[in-house]
C-alpha cells in the first residue's frame, strides 16, 4: 500500500481490547477497530480509553485502522 493512499482521521479511544487493539470512535461518528503502529509499540507509548489519537485508514477497508499518534 502506497503512503499517499491512506486516509488520516482523528478520533477518541473508546475501549481497549487484547493484543494492542482498540475501538476508536472517529470525529465523523464512525467506529473502527485500530491497532498500534510499530513506532508507538517500540517506544512503549501507553494508550488508554479517552485518549485522542490519529488513525490511518486504508481506502480498501474503512473498518480497520492503525493508530499513528497519541495527542498529549
Swiss-Prot record:
An MF annotation (GO) of this entry: rRNA binding
S-S bridge residues: none
Domain S1-like: 1-72
UniProt key word Acetylation: no
InterPro entries recorded: NA-bd_OB-fold, RNA-binding_domain_S1_IF1, S1_domain, TIF_IF1
GO cellular component annotations of the record: cytosol
Keyword Transcription regulation listed: no
Subcellular location: Cytoplasm
Top-level taxon in the UniProt lineage: Bacteria
Chief place where the protein resides: cytoplasm
Pfam families: eIF-1a (PF01176)
Matching SMART domains: S1
Keywords tagged on the record: Cytoplasm, Initiation factor, Protein biosynthesis, RNA-binding, rRNA-binding
Subunit structure: Component of the 30S ribosomal translation pre-initiation complex which assembles on the 30S ribosome in the order IF-2 and IF-3, IF-1 and N-formylmethionyl-tRNA(fMet); mRNA recruitment can occur at any time during PIC assembly.
Role: One of the essential components for the initiation of protein synthesis. Stabilizes the binding of IF-2 and IF-3 on the 30S subunit to which N-formylmethionyl-tRNA(fMet) subsequently binds. Helps modulate mRNA selection, yielding the 30S pre-initiation complex (PIC). Upon addition of the 50S ribosomal subunit IF-1, IF-2 and IF-3 are released leaving the mature 70S translation initiation complex.
Family: Belongs to the IF-1 family.
Protein name stated in the entry: Translation initiation factor IF-1
Originating species: Listeria monocytogenes serovar 1/2a (strain ATCC BAA-679 / EGD-e)
Amino acid at each position: 500500500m502506497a503512503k499517499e493512499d491512506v486516509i488520516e482521521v482523528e478520533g477518541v479511544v473508546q475501549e481497549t481490547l487484547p493484543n494492542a487493539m482498540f475501538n476508536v470512535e472517529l470525529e465523523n461518528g464512525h467506529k473502527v477497530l485500530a491497532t498500534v503502529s510499530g513506532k508507538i509499540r517500540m517506544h512503549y507509548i501507553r494508550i488508554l480509553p479517552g485518549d485522542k489519537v490519529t488513525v490511518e485508514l486504508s481506502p480498501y477497508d474503512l473498518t480497520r485502522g492503525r493508530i499513528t499518534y497519541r495527542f498529549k
